[in-house]
């Protein structure tokens, strides 16, 4: 096992536009870190630079306190698991897992010991003589992980390994990955566009946006205290409600359009007249009544999800989603009265997108 360190790493293809803005990252020995973000945010490019498949434009990469920035991938002590499995179709499972050890000159006994140990961990022992075409998608992905495990790397790199699996199998493989990490405790850097994978697998999450690490932190911290509008809108399903408005001239209210005025938890005279965006997660919106000061919402759509329901409407022309318990099924066109507890507010500067404290 080893630590992984990125020091002011950047990437530019034309010398003008930085695809990856300077990023610093310390992944502790045995830590599982997930990079998440939309397509084109730079997460896979950053992973490929750690692997040595892409050159850094500037900055340095260290694995186990050794500078590896200019080393070839084979010399970095890493093993990579890809989205498309990358198995040799003419080889059986054993030979696919053993191949990298054979070309590195390992003896037959050591190869068999390593392959069989990985196969036992991944429950592949009965499948060692099968060809990839005889395996399910989940079994193929386990073989790909087994091929990485036998290398006994300092760092595991995962590039969207579950993207090709169906929804049910993804859930199963997420659990298997968690159990695998708990057993091996190998330092891991994992890339995904799926926030559920990020939140369930990671000890720390890096939220990427346009080549910038918008926020790095524990999944619970990122969910509860998003550092920017982007993080607030990207993490969470359904997404956080975000309402543009402004602080009143006396610094005591947040006004959404002309009809909704929310009293701030405490006066903010320094924010007078400032354009802000208020965020509240759908599950934090509470049912209220007209008499208790609730805000009316006319229901335009209702999504019945089984365990709960999502009520949709608009305030001042801006979308509202409220998560209701399954027994609340308001009719389309009816009015709900809602309360936004100030303890669940997230305020952001509408111009910079940064969190306001």
From Swiss-Prot:
ATP binds at residues 37-44. This is sn-glycerol-3-phosphate import ATP-binding protein UgpC. The keyword Cell membrane applies. It is a peripheral membrane protein. Keywords: ATP-binding, Cell inner membrane, Cell membrane, Membrane, Nucleotide-binding, Sugar transport, Translocase, Transport. Coiled coil: none annotated. Belongs to the ABC transporter superfamily. sn-glycerol-3-phosphate importer (TC 3.A.1.1.3) family. Its main location: membrane. One of its GO terms (cellular component) is ATP-binding cassette (ABC) transporter complex, substrate-binding subunit-containing. GO terms for molecular function: ABC-type glycerol-3-phosphate transporter activity; ATP binding; ATP hydrolysis activity. It is found in: Cell inner membrane. Part of the ABC transporter complex UgpBAEC involved in sn-glycerol-3-phosphate (G3P) import. Responsible for energy coupling to the transport system. SMART domains: AAA (SM00382). One of its GO terms (biological process) is carbohydrate transport. Residues 4-235 form the ABC transporter domain. Pfam families: ABC_tran (PF00005), OB_MalK (PF17912). It comes from the Bacteria. It catalyses: sn-glycerol 3-phosphate(out) + ATP + H2O = sn-glycerol 3-phosphate(in) + ADP + phosphate + H(+). Its EC number is 7.6.2.10. It is an enzyme of class 7 (translocase).
